Amino acid sequence: MYNLRNRSFLNLLDFTSKDIKYLLDLSIDLKKSKYAGIEVQKLKGKNIVIIFEKDSTRTRCAFEIAAYDQGANITYLGPKGNQIGVKESMKDTARVLGRMYDAIGFRGFSQETVECLANYSNVPVYNGLTDISHPTQILADLMTIKEHKGSLKGIKIVFCGDGRGNIANSLLKGCAIMGLDFRIFAPKELFPDSNLTLKAKSLALKSGGKITITDSKEEAVKCADVVYTDVWVSMGEESNWEDRINLLKLYQVNKELMCMAKDDAIFMHCLPAFHDLSTVVGRDIFDKYGLDGIEVTEEIFESKNSVVFDVAENRVHAIKAVMVSTLG
């Protein structure tokens, strides 16, 4: 049986198209098994710890449900529930937890931190998000595209917004490896790192994919099968709202933009999304700037084209596939 036993899941560039296809197929199979009530628990007796430097709803729940479904025990260490970096270094923490647990999940700031965990724990480590990478999210994204479009090859997907963020960067890697036609629609100031773009274009050349980085809406969005966006300001950057809005307001996903994509184009977002006035941030932005939504309008978020909650659910199945393939 093809598997990834004992491997960490830190960066999509560590994996081949065959590896990722295996994980996607396994994700879909695990989802079908759960819905049919015939899921086989392959992680009984396993212990998994998840370390979160950033609070989370979807990522924490996805890790916990994935573990519970497969019979594993899980421990959550939140931003205030441990001594990491205060009384004990991450290097020492990794060696301690590696003696107690079979795998470690991490959600935080630095990619170097999750790599330190992997280097010193001697158990599989799963990257639930860092400032530059979000590989489990992209697995869920690709799974969702495959479910709705039937295939990945040649699918045209456009990311609108900050081309330097962890979602755009991770999509760039994943789409290049898997042969999609990926475009980033962003202001020039927020284009992704040039070295990463060159790497992605090289991978796309081998996979039959295509990479386009542009500030032209027509070039990016025309005939797209998938339109994707993310929040314009990440946690801890709230003071930057005004600058970001001025820079990105022309890159909002709205009816005008969606009309340039295919009629059956799907809209995707990793969540949380600022699309209405029901959050403190959404109301504050509306009061200050009068925007109908921020990165996406309510009309598009709630439209029949929106698959954002399919993506959210698929986080569980994608993370479960990573756990099963590395520990099962």
Swiss-Prot record:
PROSITE patterns assigned: CARBAMOYLTRANSFERASE
Sequence positions that bind carbamoyl phosphate: 56-59, 83, 107, 134-137, 270-271, 315
A GO molecular-function annotation: ornithine carbamoyltransferase activity
GO cellular component terms, semicolon-separated: cytoplasm
SUPFAM superfamilies hit by this protein: Aspartate/ornithine carbamoyltransferase
Localization of this protein: Cytoplasm
Reactions catalysed, as given in the entry: carbamoyl phosphate + L-ornithine = L-citrulline + phosphate + H(+)
Pfam families recorded: OTCace, OTCace_N
Domain of life: Bacteria
GO biological-process terms attached to the record: arginine biosynthetic process via ornithine; arginine catabolic process to ornithine; citrulline biosynthetic process
Pathway terms, separated by semicolons: Amino-acid degradation; L-arginine degradation via ADI pathway; carbamoyl phosphate from L-arginine: step 2/2
Record key words, sorted: Arginine metabolism, Cytoplasm, Transferase
Main location: cytoplasm
HAMAP family tied to this protein: OTCase
Family: Belongs to the aspartate/ornithine carbamoyltransferase superfamily. OTCase family.
Its job: Reversibly catalyzes the transfer of the carbamoyl group from carbamoyl phosphate (CP) to the N(epsilon) atom of ornithine (ORN) to produce L-citrulline.
Protein name: Ornithine carbamoyltransferase, catabolic
Species per Swiss-Prot/TrEMBL record: Borreliella afzelii (Borrelia afzelii)
